[in-house]
Curated annotation (Swiss-Prot):
It comes from Clostridium botulinum (strain Loch Maree / Type A3). GO terms for molecular function: methenyltetrahydrofolate cyclohydrolase activity; methylenetetrahydrofolate dehydrogenase (NADP+) activity. Catalyzes the oxidation of 5,10-methylenetetrahydrofolate to 5,10-methenyltetrahydrofolate and then the hydrolysis of 5,10-methenyltetrahydrofolate to 10-formyltetrahydrofolate. NADP(+) binds at residues 165-167, 190, 231. This is Bifunctional protein FolD. GO terms for cellular component: cytosol. The keyword Amino-acid biosynthesis applies. It holds the Pfam family THF_DHG_CYH_C. Pathway: One-carbon metabolism; tetrahydrofolate interconversion. Keywords: Amino-acid biosynthesis, Histidine biosynthesis, Hydrolase, Methionine biosynthesis, Multifunctional enzyme, NADP, One-carbon metabolism, Oxidoreductase, Purine biosynthesis. Homodimer. The keyword Oxidoreductase applies. Its EC number is 1.5.1.5, 3.5.4.9. SUPFAM superfamilies: Aminoacid dehydrogenase-like, N-terminal domain, NAD(P)-binding Rossmann-fold domains.
């Protein structure tokens, strides 16, 4: 039976520290504030937005939501971004992805002020990670993976890590981050041939495919540590990861659950980044 790596325990520890830091900012009359930019009304985006706002309220972090039409002109979006960049009371900016197809993703990401880029979307902030500099903002989901492993005293040095995702949101930045911790990395994706033969040799497997219960026990060995990043919702609203949790937990050494796993840490790290930005800009 695997050890369950609960992310909510990690999140609670981070929040305890944030409470102290937010209290010190309040003494200086500084209230951390996040601006959320959402284009359209996709149910997943609205659910994520509500979760962020709820978590911010618990820590006395202010939020400001900009609800935008999906057909917003790029010029109008950039004007709004410039205004938020110049607002002293706004410390962090988060733009929900994916963007409408008519918007240039690189231009949008590059428009976020570097010191307010709390989910590391700006190419220059990402570039720092690819150069091995982990001192600035990191993408929240890859950082959540690192924080969970750190909390449970799982050393990355010398480990063979397989990441099943090659996106700029998870797979590519995470690969650079674990390299900085002296791990050996393999990135897999939808075109990878014989995926189980690769994952079975790994010490740690991180999956972010987005297909519920796709990954079964034959993908792992008895010493595998499994980090399931995905959150998939079935027709009844129940949450599942990529990994068939009930099937796999009987075989592997350790595994994150869904829910109460990576997602809870991801949201908490977003809050941490807002507080980081408020402290740096004060």
């Amino acid at each position: 039976m695997a050890k369950i790596l609960y992310g909510n325990e990690v999140a609670l520890k981070i929040k305890e520290d944030l409470n102290l830091r937010i209290g010190k900012l309040k003494e200086k009359n500084i209230i951390p504030k996040l601006a959320i930019l959402r284009m359209g009304n996709k149910p997943d985006d609205i659910a994520y937005e509500r979760s962020i706002i709820k978590n911010c309220e618990k820590l006395n972090i202010e939020t400001k939501v900009e609800e935008l039409n999906e057909d917003i002109l790029e010029e109008d979006f950039l004007k709004l971004m410039e205004s938020l960049n110049n607002e002293k009371e706004t410390h962090g900016i988060l733009v929900f992805r994916p963007y409408p197809k008519h918007l240039n993703e690189n231009i949008i990401n590059s428009s976020i002020a570097l010191n307010k880029d709390v989910d590391c979307m700006h190419p220059l902030n990402l570039e720092r990670i690819f150069e091995g500099d982990l001192n600035g903002f990191m993408p929240c989901t890859p950082e959540a993976v690192i924080e969970i492993l750190k909390y449970y005293d799982i050393d990355l040095k010398g480990k063979n890590i397989v990441i099943i995702n090659r996106s700029m949101v998870v797979g590519k930045p995470l690969s650079m981050m674990v390299l900085s911790h002296n791990a050996t990395v393999t990135i897999c994706h939808s075109k990878t041939i014989d995926l189980p033969s690769i994952t079975k040799k790994a010490d740690i497997v991180v999956t972010a495919i987005g297909k519920a219960k796709l990954i079964k026990e034959e993908y792992f060995n008895e010493n595998s540590i499994v980090i399931d990043v995905s959150i998939n919702v079935d027709e009844n609203g129940k949450l599942y990861g990529d990994v068939d949790f009930e099937n796999v937990k009987e075989k592997v050494r350790a595994i994150t659950p869904v829910p109460k796993g990576v997602g809870s840490v991801t949201t908490t790290l977003l809050l941490k980044h807002i507080v980081d930005a408020a402290e740096r800009n004060s």
